[in-house]
Amino acid sequence: MRQDGRKQNQLREVEIIPHFTKHAEGSVLISVGDTKVICTASIENRVPPFLRGQNKGWLAAEYSMLPRATGQRTIREAAKGKLSGRTMEIQRLIGRALRAVVDLEKLGEKTIWIDCDVIQADGGTRTASITGAYVALVLAVQKAFAEKTISAWPITDFLAAISVGILPEEGAVCDLCYSEDSQAKVDMNIVQTGSGDFVEVQGSGEEAVYTRSELNELLDLAAEGIDQLIHIQRPFLGEAASWIEEKKGT
């Protein structure tokens, strides 16, 4: 039994509040246990210089944490004048993950900006960001599609992310909170599509090694958890869920 009483394969409580902000084309507040992230998707009618004239779009992501999202206040990175390596790694991960399920050529010369702002952190902020940002992305694209500013549906599959790990006593578990993550022997972040294909597998041992069979067990736990997360996402996608289902795996 885990510290909070969950089973090995049990997610924390997940809540998604759509249209959480007024101005963004798509937005959600996602809560995964005590981790809370505001995710917005904004559409701009321009692309980076390297894509100009190619009639192809782009998707990029930014990630940040409020100073008191954690137990001790941290200095804003804007005040430091530079992003930390962790922040750069996470926002690149979010961008890569979402681009994997977007046909960029169908965006035209548009950029979709994903912003993930952690307002409270208790482990799994990057995976919660991806899961929430996907819903915000679909809401934004659905709005643009209805307004005919995007002429062809570009999102090709469902997407979610989860953490898994190996704890000293409990063994393999999914969706680690901070106290579990801080003592995990092995920690992984998995991003997977609704078709079951992997987008990203980030994993490492902490003064420990793990076997191929343990890796397989972690991947199976992640796949089960991601299926549950996609099931939670779907009601918020509206009619777009059926369009994505048609395109899934194509």
Curated annotation (Swiss-Prot):
Annotated phosphate binding sites: R86, G124, T125, R126
One of the Pfam families matching this protein, by short name: RNase_PH_C
S-S bonds: none
Documented EC number(s): 2.7.7.56
Keyword set includes Calcium: no
Keywords: Nucleotidyltransferase, RNA-binding, rRNA processing, Transferase, tRNA processing, tRNA-binding
Keyword tRNA processing listed: yes
InterPro entries: ExoRNase_PH_dom1 (IPR001247), ExoRNase_PH_dom2 (IPR015847), ExoRNase_PH_dom2_sf (IPR036345), PNPase/RNase_PH_dom_sf (IPR027408), Ribosomal_Su5_D2-typ_SF (IPR020568), RNase_PH (IPR050080), RNase_PH_bac-type (IPR002381), RNase_PH_CS (IPR018336)
Matching SUPFAM superfamilies: Ribonuclease PH domain 2-like (SSF55666), Ribosomal protein S5 domain 2-like (SSF54211)
Catalytic activity, as annotated: tRNA(n+1) + phosphate = tRNA(n) + a ribonucleoside 5'-diphosphate
UniProt cross-references to Gene3D superfamilies, sorted A to Z: GHMP Kinase, N-terminal domain
BP GO terms, sorted: rRNA catabolic process; rRNA processing; tRNA processing
GO molecular function: 3'-5'-RNA exonuclease activity; tRNA binding; tRNA nucleotidyltransferase activity
Quaternary structure note: Homohexameric ring arranged as a trimer of dimers.
Family as reported in the entry's similarity comment: Belongs to the RNase PH family.
Function: Phosphorolytic 3'-5' exoribonuclease that plays an important role in tRNA 3'-end maturation. Removes nucleotide residues following the 3'-CCA terminus of tRNAs; can also add nucleotides to the ends of RNA molecules by using nucleoside diphosphates as substrates, but this may not be physiologically important. Probably plays a role in initiation of 16S rRNA degradation (leading to ribosome degradation) during starvation.
Name by which UniProt lists this protein: Ribonuclease PH
Species, as recorded: Shouchella clausii (strain KSM-K16) (Alkalihalobacillus clausii)
Organism placement in taxonomy: Bacteria, Bacillati, Bacillota, Bacilli, Bacillales
